[in-house]
Structures are given as structure tokens and as C-alpha cells.
Amino acid sequence: MTDDSKDTDLSEDNGFPTDYEIAQNADMTPIWDLLEPWDLGNDDLSYYGEYTAKLSHDAVDHLREEAKTRENNLILVTGMTPTPMGEGKTVTTVGLGQTLNHLDEEAMIAIREPSLGPVFGVKGGAAGGGYSQVLPMEEINLHFTGDLHALTSAHNLIAAMLDAKLSQSDEFDVDVNDISWPRALDMNDRALRETVIGLGGESGGVPREDGFLLTAASELMAVLCLSSDLEDLKMRVSRIIVGYENDGEPITVDDIDATGPVTMLLRDAIEPNVVQTIEGTPAFVHGGPFANIAHGTNSLIADKAAFGMGDYLVTEAGFGSDLGAEKFMNIVCRLGDMTPDAITLVASVRALKYHGLDMWPADIDEINGAGVDALEAGFVNLDKHVTNLQKFGIPVVVAVNRFPNDTDVEVNAVLNHCRNDLNVKAASSTVFAEGSEGGVELAERVIGAVESSDPEDFEYLYPADATIKEKIETVATEIYGAGSVNYSTDAEDDIERMRELGFDTVPVCLSKTFHSLTDDARQKGAPTGWTLNVRKLYPSAGAGFIVALTGDVLTMPGLPADPAAADMDIDADGDITGLF
């Protein structure tokens, strides 16, 4: 499951144009003209239509050099625990970037690219919305530049080469019950979560249990997004662990001779994609790891390129601060040698009411009908996210993403609570409805936060040489609010294996539900004293971290009874409806 199910929604019912109508009426600039001020020409760009391009490896190297002459102010956008409808994190990211440019600051935007699974599932297409969206929306949400297809092919090539070794070679004494590399598909399909393969007799391979995960959940996605260049990508691919021999020795991608062909398939996919916002701000849309399974941010290579084009980079981390932001700080910043200068925490009146009503599942009508008492009861969740972020030593600005049903009394209650009780900067944001005009106060607060920031104040939550359990327990108690951690027997065995393999000095990536600060999606607010249950651990050796599975997170979602796909169509002229 991915992030915000649908960012801010102002429908035609109240006279506001739909995202689709806004996108269709946008005055877009050809991508070659958009990028001309940075001396990026035909030799630097691979074009995918009139409004999308990939930057060549040489162009990225050039921009890395240019970045040394710029300020490199990094702004991370995250959020409180969202409702299933989403609170407008991407809208705020896009709107803030546009507004900084509106204020004559040179700003770039970097976000993740959508996965087809969620697009056709509960989310529908989205890359922002209203007057703070990234274009061309249809292309971005469908095949885009083919990155997800390349990743799917590369992932399944590894699986095929592993099974070929298993059935046609005695090179490895493979433990068929300890193969850790399933197949991948960029589509939500619950029937493929658990499969049995090799049932075609002697010529059909070795019978064994297998399964599928969503392409965005593949370790290859995390590897792509954490690689600095093609050479680094190849090295990371080579060390991915795909299974184990009966004596416990790991089998890597390099062991099955797949490093070269897999990297070959990803040669173009590692090149960052550049598009534009509705106001003409360049936007990198590249990579899409989930924040509840992997680290949840766009590619490092896109970030590094963006630093060469502007003094500000606005990027987002998936879900709430407990997931994407924590991993951005402890994994991405550590591996990418970056330090945020300010954090924008997106909150909304409806999310606060959602937590104040202690509601599961969400009932939007009941949320909208609730009063200020429910809003104030939900402050506990916002407070926890602010506290979480302050642990890293970075200035925090709360953005109250305003929806049409929000009253002045409600919005002011949130702003006053932030300013007076939490002592943090806060501003109302209407960038969905007004574009950059609706984000001026927020942008000014963020600029002030950047100017007051001191990189020396930044600190990781835990040292790299802490034990695996110490890292897990630090995140659980400091970020989630847990009182203790319980490890299953399998998890204990996995930890011992991680130690033996030498993975006890890498960051941990906790896989947890995004619906709650706890590992139970039903729990709202900010519970304390509860027990986090860790059921399994495995190494993402290529990415460079350990994944600890908690609760019941799925790597292959299923379509709902009424999927977004059912409302999509295309006419004889090729015009699409219902995508977003």
C-alpha cells in the first residue's frame, strides 16, 4: 500500500474544476525550453514526448559539479498520521516549490513516481493536485518513461536465473525453503501473494513455494534510489541476497551471474526523469520505494542533480514522520551524505479530527461533522510527530493544508496550538486552490527556518555501530511511542543470521502500518506503553539496510471491491477519463 490515497480534493460539486480539467487547460512549456536556462540540450536529454525527459549520466555529473556552487538548502516534507484519504503531502511539496520560485528563490522539486498498482487500486492517479500538481499527469501515472517496467523485468530476470541454476546446475546446494527472491508485478493482485511453481514435471523446474510482490516493493527499487551512479548501481545489484545454501551461506545476484544483465536493464531507469509543475517549476519524478516497506523517498541521483539547478530542493518522504521521515534521516541522509535544513510537517483539520474521534475505519462524513473538541483531542498525534522530528535537530514548520470544509475557527485553533503550545512555526496553506499564491506565508516561514538552521545540530537517532536490537528498540520507543519490543522466534533467528553475515552495522528499516503510530492500524492518536511485535528480519544487502517486519504489512496489495480502475475509460479520440 502506498501513500496518500488521494491528496486534497475540491470537487466540481462546489464549482471548483477537477484536477483533470486543470491539467488539460495548463499552459505547458516544452521540456527542452524549460531546461535551456541550465544549458541542458539534446546531448544531455532523452525525450519522452514534448514534456518529459531523462537526464543523461554526463548531465547528472555536470549538475553535481554545479551543485558545489549553490546553497543546497534541503527541505523535507512529511506529515502526521494520515487519514486513508491523504492530507496533501505531495500537494504541499509541489506548492511549496512553486511558491519559493514565486518569491524569486531558485527551487526544484523531487518526488516519487507512481506505481500502477495503487493507481488502479484505491488511490487513482495523482502527483499533487489542483493548482499544485506535476504534469503531464496522464503520462506520469501510466507508463511514464518505463522505469517500473524496467525494474519489473530486471527483478524477474533474477528470479528466472535463480530457478535456472536451481533446476539445471549443481553449482549450489540451494535450500529451496530459504529462497528470498519472489517474482514481481506492477499491479495489485492478491491471488499472487503466495504461489507454487515448478509443477510442470521434470522440464518445469523444481517445485517450490513462491510468490509475487509489487514492483515498488522490490529491493531493486530501493537499490536504484540509493545508487549514486551506474557503477554504484552495478555494485549494489551484485550483492543482493536471493537465497541461501543448506549450510547457511548466502547466494547473491553475482553468484548466479545476473549482475551484468540486470544492470543493463536498469541503465536508462537510473537516469532521473524531469517534468514540470503547473506553474513551470522543474520537477524530478524518479523512483518510488514505499515508506512502509523500504525507505520511501525518490532517488538520490535526482536529489543530487536538483541541487545543481537551484538553491532549494523540496522533497517528500512517504506517510507520516514515523515512517518516511525517520528513514530519510537515518538511512537516506546517512547513505547519501545529506542534511535537511528544514522540515515541513503537513497536518489537516480532518486528520486531527480522525485521531480525536479514535476512528477506524474512517468515515469522512462523521469527520467533517465533528467539532473543535474532536480536533483538539487529535492534537496528541500532531504533537508526537513534531516531537519526533525535533529529535533530529532540524527546524520544523507545520503546514495546515486547508480543505474547503475547514472553518477559520478550526484552522486558527491548529495554528495557535502549534505556535503557543508547541512553540513551532506554522502557517495555513491553500496551494491546492491557489497555487503559489496560497503558499506565501508557508514559504516565508520555511525560508526563515532554513536561515536559522545549523547543520551541526543534525543528529541521527542511533549510531551505526549500535546492535540490531538497540536500533529497532530506539525507533520503537523514541519514534513510535512503544514501551517494549517483542521478537518472534523467527526474528531472533534472523537477528543471529544478520550478525553472522556482518549486517549489524547497517541502518534498520522497520516495516510497519502507516495507519497508526503503532503496529495496529486501528489505534489512533499517540498510544504509549504498547509492545511492538517484530516477526521477521531480512537483509537488503544491495540497498544497505536491514528490514524488520512488524504487524501485518503486505508487499503485494489487492484491489478493493470497487477499484479506481472501474471508473476509468478512454474514448475513440484517446481522451482518458477517471484517471485522476
UniProtKB/Swiss-Prot annotation:
Pathway-wise, it operates in:
One-carbon metabolism; tetrahydrofolate interconversion
Q: Does the keyword Ligase apply?
A: yes
- What Gene Ontology biological process does one annotation of this record name? tetrahydrofolate interconversion
Named from the GO MF annotations, one term is: ATP binding
Q: Which UniProt keywords apply?
A: ATP-binding, Ligase, Nucleotide-binding, One-carbon metabolism
Which family does the similarity line name?
A: Belongs to the formate--tetrahydrofolate ligase family.
* S-S pairs: none
This protein's name: Formate--tetrahydrofolate ligase
Q: What is its EC number?
A: 6.3.4.3
Give residues annotated as binding ATP: 83-90
Q: What does it catalyze?
A: (6S)-5,6,7,8-tetrahydrofolate + formate + ATP = (6R)-10-formyltetrahydrofolate + ADP + phosphate
Question: Does the record carry RNA-binding as a key word?
Answer: no
Q: Which SUPFAM superfamilies match?
A: P-loop containing nucleoside triphosphate hydrolases
